[in-house]
Amino acid sequence: MKKVLALIVAATMGLSSVAFAAETTAAATAAPAATSTTAAPAVEKAAPAKATHHKKHKATKQTTEQKAQAAKKAVKKAPAQKAQAAKKAVKKAPVQKAQAAKKHVKKAPAQKAQAAKKHHKTAKKSATAPAA
């Protein structure tokens, strides 16, 4: 009953598990003075509690390392996608503009030349008609 109460108080106050383990071992050493048969199991139970504490501590380290790796992966992926999209957009736009400019330049002079030829032909015909 006292151990449960001590556990609740330690949890609410935020004491570290190391301090709590020290309290349980102190209580275990006081118990052998009272009875020797119940003291032996209490001492055996105190040692595994410390071992589990170390395992939990290692687990928390792994989670922080995993978070760091996930953050690195996310940072690497985003800029690569942006760079690819920028390259594609820059390459496509100038090619289309150049093609459109070529088409307009070629069509306009061809029409002007044909119109000029027609005018010259009609002018020549009219000039030769009065002479004949």
From Swiss-Prot:
InterPro entries: Acid_shock (IPR023497). It comes from Yersinia enterocolitica serotype O:8 / biotype 1B (strain NCTC 13174 / 8081). Its main location: periplasm. Residues 22-69 form a propeptide. It holds the Pfam family Asr. Residues 30-50, 61-99 have a biased composition (Low complexity). This is Acid shock protein. Residues 51-60, 100-124 have a biased composition (Basic residues).
